[in-house]
């Protein structure tokens, strides 16, 4: 999917996000430029830096969703973080390099799970052999037997043993042994009674004390009595974990993060300022200056190795109600050359959001109630009324964009969702009258709508 053309990327984003053509166009170009960079000769490739983007617009217009869908579309490592969570170096709080370490951690875990899925078949075969070893012990004595149900006859002849093993294998595969109990050893690392070391303050070095001491701590092996079916699952996961090549996983993760990582810096407007804060307030300009080397390209130490940030794509977003992008320090402004303003959503967009996307809100509620055997239907006038109410409440209270639809839909369908398991009438129609009945009293009362919707 990484070689998608800009028009194809926009088309894919249109399936989930309504409107915001300019923002979609900008991120599509940024993504295609990554593919173009990989086709450039080696001597010039490292010189081409990603064109970072600032998405400007009120809450609930699709800023975060555009970045998240973009990452899923391209299978890129993605991490979202609020810029306001960071503090200047020297203050208590998270340092800016932690977002690179977190992105690396997420990518390693994702690749590890994928590799475990790839070796699942082999792991299941190995787990099956271990189960058969438990069911048919080598020794004829009582110590060798691990079955806690009536024992299978232990045979000494190798040919008879092989024949018996194959019979057991067939029974195991047919599920005839699932209810038997076996004793298995489950290994875990011992945890100290008191946590002496804390990771606080060691993030800067990418050091994790638990990982450093992990091999020194004694293994904590517990013997558990479980049914064969559960033992099969436990042992399969155990074998899959042993089959994963962590060196390859780590190397691939570093490569993915460096070449195709995306970091979404939300609320960047909260750290925009002139750095004239006094007293206990942490300098906003200080956080910006800490962000600068990460965005422009530096090497960040992590427990998986050093990660270079030169080609990570940074997408920042903010409402910029009070501050302006020009309030960011000039050096940081220069690292975000593309700025896109997202438009506020109106009634027409709300109607489309409710019905058009692949994950449309109405489709979600229909699918949820179908699990109870209830068929939910929305008339066009009901959808129109819901959109009108969302616009009205946004204008009279706080404008939270499309998120208002979630609160309205939840309140609208509250009674249906509550009584769905018990109702005899399995087809329910939501029309304009139903919407008026459920919501108009709340909408008319501004105090109620402020707290409920």
UniProtKB/Swiss-Prot annotation:
CDD domains: RecA-like_HslU (cd19498). It comes from the Bacteria. InterPro entries: AAA+_ATPase, ATP-dep_Clp_protease_ClpX, ATPase_AAA_core, Clp_ATPase_C, HslU, P-loop_NTPase. SUPFAM superfamilies: P-loop containing nucleoside triphosphate hydrolases. One of its GO terms (biological process) is proteolysis involved in protein catabolic process. Keywords: ATP-binding, Chaperone, Cytoplasm, Nucleotide-binding. ATP binds at residues 18, 60-65, 266, 331, 403. The keyword ATP-binding applies. One of its GO terms (cellular component) is HslUV protease complex. GO terms for molecular function: ATP binding; ATP hydrolysis activity; peptidase activity; proteasome-activating activity. It is found in: Cytoplasm. The keyword Nucleotide-binding applies. A double ring-shaped homohexamer of HslV is capped on each side by a ring-shaped HslU homohexamer. The assembly of the HslU/HslV complex is dependent on binding of ATP. Belongs to the ClpX chaperone family. HslU subfamily. ATPase subunit of a proteasome-like degradation complex; this subunit has chaperone activity. The binding of ATP and its subsequent hydrolysis by HslU are essential for unfolding of protein substrates subsequently hydrolyzed by HslV. HslU recognizes the N-terminal part of its protein substrates and unfolds these before they are guided to HslV for hydrolysis. PANTHER family: ATP-DEPENDENT CLP PROTEASE ATP-BINDING SUBUNIT CLPX-LIKE, MITOCHONDRIAL-RELATED (PTHR48102), ATP-DEPENDENT PROTEASE ATPASE SUBUNIT HSLU (PTHR48102:SF3). This is ATP-dependent protease ATPase subunit HslU. It comes from Desulforapulum autotrophicum (strain ATCC 43914 / DSM 3382 / VKM B-1955 / HRM2) (Desulfobacterium autotrophicum).
């Amino acid at each position: 999917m990484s070689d998608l053309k800009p028009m194809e990327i926009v088309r894919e984003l249109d399936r989930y996000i309504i409107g915001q053509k300019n923002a979609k166009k900008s991120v599509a170009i940024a993504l295609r430029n990554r593919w173009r960079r990989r086709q450039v000769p080696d001597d010039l490739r490292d010189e081409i830096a990603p064109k970072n983007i600032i998405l400007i617009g009120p809450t609930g217009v699709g800023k975060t969703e555009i970045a998240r869908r973009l990452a899923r579309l391209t299978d890129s490592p993605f991490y979202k973080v609020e810029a306001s969570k960071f503090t200047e170096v020297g203050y208590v709080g998270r340092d800016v390099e932690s977002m690179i370490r977190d992105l690396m951690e997420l990518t390693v875990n994702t690749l590890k799970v994928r590799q475990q899925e790839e070796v699942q078949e082999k792991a299941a075969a190995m787990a099956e052999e271990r189960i058969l070893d438990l069911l048919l012990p080598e020794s004829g004595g009582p110590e060798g037997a691990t079955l806690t149900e009536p024992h299978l006859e232990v045979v000494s002849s190798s040919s008879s043993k092989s024949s018996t093993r194959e019979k057991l294998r067939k029974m195991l595969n047919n599920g005839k042994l699932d209810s038997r109990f076996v004793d298995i050893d489950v290994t875990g690392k011992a945890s100290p009674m008191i946590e002496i070391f804390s990771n606080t303050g060691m993030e800067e070095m990418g050091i994790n004390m638990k990982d450093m001491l992990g091999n020194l701590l004694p293994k904590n092996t517990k013997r558990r009595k479980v049914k064969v079916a559960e033992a099969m699952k436990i042992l399969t996961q155990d074998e899959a974990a042993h089959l994963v090549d962590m060196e390859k996983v780590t190397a691939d993760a570093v490569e993915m993060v460096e070449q195709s990582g995306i970091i979404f810096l939300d609320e960047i407007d909260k750290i925009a300022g002139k750095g004239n804060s006094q007293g206990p307030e942490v300098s906003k300009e200080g956080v910006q200056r800490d962000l600068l080397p990460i965005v422009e390209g530096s090497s960040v130490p992590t427990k998986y190795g050093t990660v270079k940030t030169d080609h990570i794509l940074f997408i920042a977003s903010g409402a910029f109600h009070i501050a302006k992008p020009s309030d960011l320090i000039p050096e940081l402004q220069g690292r975000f050359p593309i700025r896109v303003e997202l438009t506020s959503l109106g009634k027409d967009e709300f109607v489309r959001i409710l019905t058009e996307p692949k994950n449309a809100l109405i489709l979600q509620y229909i699918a949820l109630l179908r699990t109870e055997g209830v068929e939910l239907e929305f008339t066009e006038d009901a959808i129109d009324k819901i959109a009108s109410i969302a616009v009205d409440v946004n204008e009279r209270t706080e404008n939270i964009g499309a998120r208002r639809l979630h609160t309205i839909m939840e309140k609208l369908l509250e009674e249906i969702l509550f009584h769905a398991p018990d109702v005899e009438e399995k087809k329910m129609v939501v029309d304009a009258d139903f919407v008026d009945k459920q919501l108009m009293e709340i909408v008319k009362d501004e105090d109620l709508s402020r707290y409920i919707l």
